[in-house]
C-alpha cells in the first residue's frame, strides 16, 4: 500500500536540518487546509495520511471528484505498522521531520530513507547546486535562456555588480 503525505513545508524543514521542525503558521495552515490533495492522484488501494480524517473527507468532497480514496490518521498508521502491513511512503518531499513522524508511528527505519539519502536531497534542492548542475543543461533546450551566479559573501556580490551593474 502506498501512503501519501502532503507536507508543503518540506523545503523549510529540509533547510532547517532539524529533526523536530515546527513550520511557520502559514505552512501549518497550508498543510491542514490541503491535506486531501494527494487523494487526487492516489489509487483506490492507496491512503493519504492526515491529521483529521473527517476534515480531509469534507475538503475532498468539495472537489466533486468521484473516486474512492482512503484517509488515515497517525493512530491508524501506528496500528498498521504494528501489524507489519507492507507500506510504501510517498511524501510531497522527504525530510527528517517526516521520517521522524513515521518512526514515532512504529514504521521500521529499514523502510525509510537514511541520513545519506536525506542529505543528498538537501544538497540537490539548494539553488546553488541547481544553478551549477541543472541550468547549463536546461539552457541547451531550444528557446530557453538563463544565467545564474552564486554569491557566498558581500565581496563576491560587489564583484558581480561591478561587472554586470545589475542583478
Question: At which residue positions do the language-model features occur?
Answer:
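N-terminal-proximal low-complexity accessory segments that begin disordered
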Residues: 1-50
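Conserved N-proximal alpha/beta basic substrate-recognition cap immediately N-terminal to
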Residues: 27-41, 49-167
Amino acid at each position: 500500500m502506498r501512503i501519501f503525505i502532503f507536507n508543503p513545508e518540506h523545503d523549510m524543514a529540509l533547510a532547517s536540518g532539524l529533526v523536530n521542525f515546527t513550520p511557520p503558521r502559514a505552512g501549518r495552515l497550508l498543510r491542514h487546509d490541503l491535506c486531501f490533495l494527494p487523494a487526487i492522484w492516489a489509487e483506490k488501494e492507496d491512503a493519504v495520511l492526515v491529521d483529521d480524517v473527517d476534515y480531509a473527507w469534507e475538503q475532498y468532497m468539495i472537489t466533486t471528484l468521484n473516486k474512492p480514496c482512503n484517509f488515515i490518521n497517525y493512530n491508524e498508521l501506528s496500528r498498521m505498522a504494528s501489524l507489519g502491513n507492507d507500506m510504501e511512503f510517498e511524501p510531497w518531499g522527504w525530510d527528517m521531520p517526516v521520517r521522524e513522524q513515521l518512526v514515532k508511528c512504529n514504521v521500521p527505519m529499514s523502510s525509510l530513507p537514511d541520513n545519506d539519502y536525506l542529505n543528498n536531497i538537501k544538497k540537490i534542492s539548494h539553488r546553488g547546486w541547481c544553478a551549477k548542475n541543472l541550468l547549463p543543461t536546461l539552457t541547451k533546450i531550444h528557446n530557453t535562456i538563463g544565467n545564474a551566479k552564486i554569491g557566498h559573501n558581500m565581496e563576491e556580490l560587489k564583484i558581480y555588480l561591478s561587472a554586470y551593474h545589475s542583478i
